[in-house]
Amino acid sequence: MILRVVNELSMKTIRMYQEEDQNEVLALWHECNLIHSKNDPQKDLRRKKGFGEELFLVLVNEDKIIGTVMGGYDGHRGIINYLGVHPNFRGNGLARMLLQAVENKLRDLGCPQVNLSVWSDNTEVLKFYEKTDYKKANDIVLLRKRLIEDE
């Protein structure tokens, strides 16, 4: 699926991630501060291959990737990771557009609910998700266990 949005300045396209996008996506994730010391983004890209690749979307403007969202679905719940838009393109509804695109794909797969994690001190992102109808799950505690160390 390709979604095209035209505005007065340029045409933006949402399409599936392709392997040749790797370097550009990694650079964008750094620019968007989506990289944390606890994960290896190159390994995340390799691990995504073969697991719901149709849910990994990039936003392209004039042949340059300016946004990403990585969705997942296990048949029970959906998950969203790596939602980000280049700082020069923020404030134009593009993150919301990417989020809606992956939500639509998840809905088409029969996904009843989406979960996501946000670092607790990332108030700007928390506000964004609250504006897009995501609610804090006060009745749930996120637990995690590392099975493979990313060095």
Where are these regions (language model features)?
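Conserved beta-hairpin
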Residues: L55-G67
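Conserved acetyl-CoA-binding loop-helix of GNAT-fold acetyltransferases
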Residues: V85, G91-N104, K131
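Conserved beta-strand-loop-alpha-helix junction that forms the acyl-donor binding cleft
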Residues: L116-V125, R144-I148
